[in-house]
Regions:
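Short glycine/serine-rich loop segments
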Residues: 141-160
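Basic nucleic-acid-binding alpha-helical/helix-turn surface characteristic of O6-alkylguanine DNA
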Residues: 1-141
Length: 160
């Protein structure tokens, strides 16, 4: 499988907290806002380190906000935008010459982060099966766990 250097070059992932062990993230402030994109309306949220959540608004803003808040129990939410959000939104429509690095600050297990990093390597316009991703992670029998990790991706708009 040919690598997707565009995604790997412009999206960086930092671990926020271990999703299995962290039920509360006290002291963390998450800024969030709504924005229109050519794909539809999205809710984008960020910590001071990077974008932590980005999803389409499908069932209204209240439901989107509630779904986001359920992912981050115990944190302080603040309506607002920042540079991380601006870069994430710009990445949806930017060409390679004008693209800036989008730092992600994701809550997930070590395995989930490995899967999400592997998704960045899938070439634009191509697909990979759960089995292919599991094999690339040197764990070919973990295809179901790969599927679960993909389903839990909090920034599927950026890492499809």
């Amino acid at each position: 499988m040919e690598r997707n250097l565009l995604n790997e070059r412009f999206i960086t992932i930092e671990k926020l907290a271990d999703g299995e062990l962290s039920h509360k993230l006290p002291g963390l402030t998450v800024k969030f806002s709504f924005a229109e994109t050519f794909l539809g309306e999205v809710l984008v949220a960020s910590t001071p380190q990077g974008v932590c959540y980005m999803a389409f608004v499908v069932r209204g803003r209240d439901m989107a906000e509630s779904e986001m808040m359920n992912r981050f129990p115990g944190v302080f939410f603040e309506i607002g935008t920042d540079e991380h959000q601006r870069r994430a939104l710009a990445a949806l429509s930017a060409d390679e010459e004008n693209m800036e690095t989008v730092p992600l600050h994701l809550k997930g297990t070590d395995f989930q982060l490995r899967v999400w990093n592997e998704l960045l390597k899938i070439p634009f316009g191509e697909t990979a099966t759960y089995g292919e991703i599991a094999a690339a992670l040197q764990n070919p029998k973990a295809y179901r766990a790969v599927g679960t990790a993909i389903g839990d991706n909090p920034v599927a708009v950026l890492i499809p």
